[in-house]
Each structure stands twice: as structure tokens, then as C-alpha cells.
Amino acid sequence: MENVNTVKLGLLTIMGAIGAFISKLFGGWDMALNTLVIFMAIDYITGLIVAGVFNKSCKSENGGLESRAGWKGICKKCMTLFIVLVAVRLELALGTTFIKDGVVIAYVVNEAISIVENAGLMGLPIPNVIKKAIDVLQKQGDEQ
């Protein structure tokens, strides 16, 4: 039992250190970055549902699940985070504080649009308040 607790503590320590490193790398884990990661996960999951359940994916030839399309989606999500990381480093180099926020807002809007598109492919009506919120975010991103 003591070995289990030691291993558990070791794993938690390693995970905490990795989390702290990633947070530091991204200039802190703020609400915007948290929102982006959540939206990325929702978009990926709803994309899987559109392909796997509804067979309406535009990412595959037959509209169904395809491992290559899923892998491309994961690669794009990783590249999005790399671009955010580039924005953070540019902020540090230039001594500004708005580049990361502008980039994150742009990607949040992109993910939100994709989530809404996935919902539409599932046959769900999209409330106007969601459409208006996306428009507001898009305008904020354009201003920055």
C-alpha cells in the first residue's frame, strides 16, 4: 500500500510540474486560454459525433469516421496552440500585452463557429444569442 501511495505521489508531482511548465510557457493559464482549450475539445468531440453518429462529416469521403481526418484534426489543434505560444513569445520580445489575447480570441471564434457548424450538421437549431456572441468576439479579434 505504501508503494502505491509513493507512485501516486510521484505521478502527481510530475503532472504538476508539467502543468506548471506549460502554464509558464503560455504566459500563465488565463480565462481566454482556458476557453480556447475547452472549445477545442468540444469541437473535436462534436466532430467525432458528426462523423461517427450522423455520418455527415465533410472531412471524410463517406462522411463517417476516418482515422486520417481525426489525426489531421489533432495536428491542427496542436498547431493552434503553437501559434498561441508564438504570440506569447512575440509579446515578451516586443514588450506588449495584446498579441496573445488577439490570437486566442481569433481561435476561440474559429472554434465556436466550427462547434456551431457541427451542431447544424446534427440538425440542432442555433440560438441567436450564440450567433451574436460569436459576432461580438469576431469584432473584438479584428480590433486587436
Where are the language model's segments positioned?
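Canonical alpha-helical transmembrane segment with a positive-inside/aromatic-interface signature
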Residues: 112-144
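Hydrophobic alpha-helical transmembrane segments of multi-pass integral membrane proteins
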Residues: 13-19, 37, 75-89, 103-111
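Loop-to-helix transition at the N-terminal end of transmembrane alpha-helices
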Residues: 30-45
